[in-house]
């Protein structure tokens, strides 16, 4: 299939779509949970369990997204997902029982899997092939501002209206987000199913390495970010230091965009993975040097920002573009399960071993992550030396 020309406005419109979708779904409980608890009497864990349920729904749907993209086209899939997130906000606004609350999060989970990064990036790669790589970087730059925009916006809404009314405002934002997907060209593949191409030993190895690598990174990143306030409090710093996380995340993505084609997916993967153990050692040294805690928050925020780009662009180096949606749909399932499990796992770990003990466990996992990154890069180098054509520039 010949790739389409890339519209200039597409990074802006899809970036705004992602900023809204993340802001009104994933980041929503962080703003509204306290107000919901005060009004409904539901516990904070019960409220956040809705988000965990949504993540599990995302994992369950993952294998089917590639077929949906092929049959319906990326524009329709991402638009439907955005509308479902909008609808879920509307249902939550009228929820008076946890059953309704969880039902709304199931709807949100379906919408999130159809319209957040993974589905959008698969749609862009299907349409534009290797051209999509720079657009993906720009979209993550905009999407990374979701918490910066929607946390203060949610707080401001709560000063003038109830959380239920605020969720209805979020639902309207969801409708705007759905309208932005009209900038994505409508394109579908022929509905006749072709058998998946046979996978060789190197291809299977790439798949296992990628799935394990992203799953472990997701586990550490989600667990660390969820319990970041505990770490900051444990070293005696004000919670406002957590703002450095967002600054690091946005700054790193901006620098990646500026670096351009010189920073290939393989180089970015290696740089990100090798920086992780060093960053956690910086955090562990905070028991002796207080300033290093702030350095850890800033540094790991930067790493977390790059991880999203690595997850999206590395498959372009490992697999053919036409296989991107199908392969990532399956290979990202472990990561999505880890995303759902990591907050609870880290809560248990911090209780059992303390915050610093949990940091040591994370540091050990980052060594494994770094080793996997080296294996991926070496595997691609060996493939090139063997004369196998590269899949990307």
Model-identified regions with their sequence ranges:
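Extracytoplasmic gate region of multi-pass secondary transporters
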Residues: 29-34, 203-257
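Cytoplasmic helix-loop-helix junction between adjacent transmembrane helices
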Residues: 105-141, 320
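Helix-to-loop junctions at the C-terminal end of transmembrane segments
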Residues: 61-74, 252-265, 350-351
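Symmetry-related core transmembrane helices of the 12-TM Major Facilitator Superfamily/SLC fold
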Residues: 165-183, 358-375
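Extracytoplasmic
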Residues: 9-44, 61-65, 151, 224-229
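A late C-terminal transmembrane helix in Major Facilitator Superfamily
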Residues: 147, 318-353
